[in-house]
Amino acid sequence: MFARGSRRRRSGRAPPEAEDPARGQPCNSCREQCPGFLLHGWRKICQHCKCPREEHAVRTVPVDLERIMCRLISDFQRHSISDDDSGCASEEYAWVPPGLKPEQVYQFFSCLPEDKVPYVNSPGEKYRIKQLLHQLPPHDSEAQYCTALEEEEKKELRAFSQQRKRENLGRATVRIFPVTITGAICEECGKQIGGGDIAVFASRAGLGACWHPQCFVCTTCQELLVDLIYFYHAGKVYCGRHHAECLRPRCQACDEIIFSPECTEAEGRHWHMGHFCCFECEASLGGQRYVMRQSRPHCCACYEARHAEYCDGCGEHIGLDQGQMAYEGQHWHASDRCFCCSRCSRPLLGRPFLPRRGLIFCSRACSLGSETTAPGPGRRSWSAGTVTTPLTTSTASFSATEGTSETASKGTCTKAEPAAGPEEPSHFLRGAPHRHSMPELGLRSAPEPPTESPGHPAPHPDDNAFGRQSTPRVSFRDPLVSEGGPRRTLSAPPAQRRRPRSPPPRTPSCHHHHHHRRRRQRHRRRGSHHHHHHPGRHGHHRCDLGSGSDSGSCSSSPSSPSSESSEDDGFFLGERIPLPPHLCRPRTTQDTSTETFNSPAQPLVQESHPVMPRQTRDKNCIVA
């Protein structure tokens, strides 16, 4: 992180190509397509394949980079990155953690993936060199590895490097976790690190912070921190590259930190003012149209010449201003001439098509090579519309404007439209559900209203709530509280309402009255509210619970569940149950004189049952 030592060494530095150990090395990504690494004039990439330096087969760590690394850790470690106490670094491993015994070194590397263990002349050693070049860029620390920096920018770079080293840089240590301690939690995965396990400790993160060896990775790229060198910032560990990007923007062209007061920003990335140019021809793109490909800007001419798609219909380039259709790696111009059936040339824009062996067809008949036939009633009916407006956007799907067509379908309907004519009435067209047809709602089915007769007047329209209407509608209402006639409301408290009441007097003269009233109650529960007029019968009056006579001037309400049982209300095993004292009142002469049913002023009992022999009552009773 320090500047180079003397001005004389800096001025007498040879060109980068003469001392670059990566020059001529093959590219690991392009293989034989790249003739060898050749550093670009100001980009940190190869001039041939456009790949970065670390993608090429660099066999050894550059000397300058190793010196920079030594200075980076000079305040933390007195030895170099290859010094250790194991004695096996030069024999088996290209690098080992310092201060470990041989058995501890094996224990540490056993926690890492096999392809990342830095054995000598192994993929792990190549991985280490690649990560050194990527995670610790030399141009982030010293100005001599940068291009065209102003004096003010060089001062800012030196101050930037010293600040990072002073506040963020650190090198982790590896040691066995003490057995006497109960254990710790890994800062990355959150799992337990037990006593006797190998652990990585970072002093910048605090005394208790530790990681599993395989968990000590950069927060941004999730790669192992090479040689345990880390930068601690805001409670997280970073590699050198991504920590610098947390503080300053990085130019996407030259890969250097931007210290100039002005820069270009596009699509969340940054460039130096003079570096925002075409990736191929390096023409300036300031105020020009460009295409971003793999985070690299291209001018329109270079993009069409190098990366534009070829049309599978005509074989020509698909321009940037031309719409295109794409399907599973195939591309067509968004025109009727190119995107059409390969046999009958029927336009397919906005219509379904059948791909077969790299070609597209309008129907199965065309795909099989037979003559096309007109669509029948059971076939797909294909629209004959055409595209009337040109498409100017390059997207995968288009909404084409279709002309007049006899069918309203776009190839998705498999049945012809019904012929025009008088509509046949359907049984289900007006089949809106009624309340009486929904037993799941807890409602009873309403019977059909009886035929009107001179002696039975028609019911009121509001009384029949379940009757059919001319325009049925679905109407969900709460279930009715009472299924019978008007509900009788008692003024007594609920506890008193549940007590049995005294029965009415059972006289032969009342049998006909009671039988008629029971039948009328059934009609009321079925929704029929006809008033039966019988000559010689007394009118029905409301029962008064306050009469309290033992002869039974009051009966149970119509909603009582025991109104139709074999046992009379107020009787148990044939014996009358007396009323409680608070419901009884002294009988007067007037009350006694009104207990006979021959008096026209006496209200009739609302509901009672005919007199039954005691033997019958005894047989049908149920002892609770």
Curated annotation (Swiss-Prot):
InterPro entries: LIM1_prickle, LIM2_prickle, LIM3_prickle, PET_domain, PET_prickle, Pk/Esn/Tes, Znf_LIM. One of its GO terms (molecular function) is zinc ion binding. Its main location: cytoplasm. PANTHER family: LIM DOMAIN-CONTAINING PROTEIN, PRICKLE PLANAR CELL POLARITY PROTEIN 3. Coiled coil: none annotated. The keyword Nucleotide-binding does not apply. It is a peripheral membrane protein. Belongs to the prickle / espinas / testin family. Disruption phenotype: Prickle3 knockdown results in reduced respiratory complex V activity, altered complex V assembly, and abnormal mitochondrial morphology observed in the retina. Mutant mice exhibit degeneration of retinal ganglion cells, fewer retinal neurofilaments than wild-type mice, abnormalities of the retinal vasculature, and significantly reduced retinal function. Involved in the planar cell polarity (PCP) pathway that is essential for the polarization of epithelial cells during morphogenetic processes, including gastrulation and neurulation. PCP is maintained by two molecular modules, the global and the core modules, PRICKLE3 being part of the core module. Distinct complexes of the core module segregate to opposite sides of the cell, where they interact with the opposite complex in the neighboring cell at or near the adherents junctions. Involved in the organization of the basal body. Involved in cilia growth and positioning. This is Prickle planar cell polarity protein 3. The gene is Prickle3. It is found in: Cytoplasm; Cell membrane; Mitochondrion. Keywords: Cell membrane, Cilium biogenesis/degradation, Cytoplasm, Developmental protein, LIM domain, Membrane, Metal-binding, Mitochondrion, Phosphoprotein, Repeat, Zinc. Residues 447-458 have a biased composition (Pro residues). Residues 1-12, 509-541 have a biased composition (Basic residues). Residues 383-409, 545-564 have a biased composition (Low complexity). Residues 184-249, 250-309, 310-373 form the LIM zinc-binding domain. Disulfide bonds: none annotated. One of its GO terms (biological process) is cell projection organization. It holds the Pfam family PET. Residues 1-26, 371-617 are annotated as: Disordered.
